[in-house]
Structures are given as C-alpha cells and as structure tokens.
Amino acid sequence: MAIANVNDLMAQALQEIYDAEHQFLEGQREMDQQATDEDLKSSIQQHISDTEQQIRNLEQVFEQLGQQPQRQTNEVAQGLVSEAQQNMQEAENEAIRDCAIIAAVIKVEHFEMGSYRGLVTGAQQMGQNEIANLLSENMQQEEQTAQIAEQSAPDLFQKAG
C-alpha cells in the first residue's frame, strides 16, 4: 500500500494494529491453556475480554472512517507471538512456562502501548476526537494490563527459583 499522506499512514497503522490484536488474542488463548498459576490465568482471561473489546473499538474506528475493517499483517506481532510460543514449548516445567508467559505479556503490552500512543496522536492531530477517544480507551487497557503483569512477574519468577 502506497503511503501518500497522513490519512494513508493512519489507515495502514490501524490495519496493522487490528491484525496485531487478532494475533495477540489467539496467543492469549494459547497462554491461558498453558498457564498454571491461577492469578496468571485470571489476568490472561481478563485480558482476553479486554482484547475482544479493543477489536470492537477498532471496528468502530474503521466504521467512523467509512472503511471496512481490514487486517494488514503485523510482522512485529507475528514475531512476538512466535517467540512466546517457542519459549512456552521449550520451558522445562510449569513454573518456567508461567515466567515465559508473563515475560511475553509484558513485551506485547509495551508494543501495543507504543502503537496506540502513535495512533492517538495521529487521530488528535487530524481532529478525529471520537476516534482518539476509542484508541485512548484501548491504550489505557494496555497500560493497566502491563502494570498488572509487571507487578505479578517478580512472584512468578521467585516461584520458578
């Protein structure tokens, strides 16, 4: 897709984050199946619900722009999901797998926060306040998830010894 102006850039970024959210949703479902720590499972399940809402918010953004929701492959998301899957598979025990999961969650959340910050700024500069609000909602959910993950990581790593 040629990027001739800011609108094109925003459209591409939206398509990429839309794809990323779908990829991460599938990854979260896999993490939920493999996690053993109950608090970790609970936070993953909450984030699955949040991610489903974020996808709906992105669909509203596309609608407000008069576009059909469309996914453009997000290679960063592919890499993060692939790395998480590999680390979960190679973990020698459940506690190590839980550590691999929380580490992956933290990486993903920081990628998403950066993506949404750029999108919010773009929407604000284009005068698209309703769109900026929807994207800000997603960004705030990502920030909350990152905070929860970062707070729970030390306990998981301590359990893994």
Feature map (PLM): residue ranges:
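Amphipathic alpha-helical hairpins
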Residues: 1-161
